[in-house]
């Protein structure tokens, strides 16, 4: 199990390096890297399924800590899958904007010799307006995607906290921890839950304000 865990963890780190490369590539060059990332995510998820089976072969005294490590891998992979989807949508928008811009430019150059100055100025204005509108839409989409990623991250953390609470209770019963120690641990979990709820509320408010002011 240890060998497969470290192998999967290395795949996750490799995917993170691919994302760093992705931010430096053009829209056309990004496609191959995105496909490579998807293959690695699929492979890592398959490894996690195997790790879930191997957990039952781990000694009971080590099973809880091993499960926590596997759960962390799953959480990282969910986050990477969301990031990949966001990157794909961003690339598609960039390619669409490039295509529309080229169409406007070609239309402008075709009409340049035959149309009067007023028409050329109108085409220049339309091109500038289209560029500004595309930038605004891309900014809104990026903010919404970023907010969605944050919300998904918070939800995943909430699920992780809930699972951790149950595992801590099980470990406490096994190890015979005192009631005072268990109460301290539960108090910390309650504080983490309040932080989670506050984070969700603040994130939703920020997204709502951004959309409101951009629409005005």
Swiss-Prot record:
It holds the Pfam family V-SNARE_C. It comes from the Eukaryota. Gene3D superfamilies: 1.20.5.110, t-snare proteins. GO terms for cellular component: endoplasmic reticulum membrane; ER to Golgi transport vesicle membrane; Golgi apparatus; Golgi membrane; late endosome membrane; SNARE complex. It is a single-pass type IV membrane protein. Residues 216 are vesicular. Its main location: Golgi. Residues 62-103 form a coiled coil. It is found in: Golgi apparatus, cis-Golgi network membrane; Golgi apparatus membrane; Endoplasmic reticulum membrane. The chain crosses the membrane at residues 195-215. Belongs to the GOSR2 family. PANTHER family: GOLGI SNAP RECEPTOR COMPLEX MEMBER 2 (PTHR21230:SF1), VESICLE TRANSPORT V-SNARE PROTEIN VTI1-RELATED (PTHR21230). This is Probable Golgi SNAP receptor complex member 2. It comes from Drosophila melanogaster.
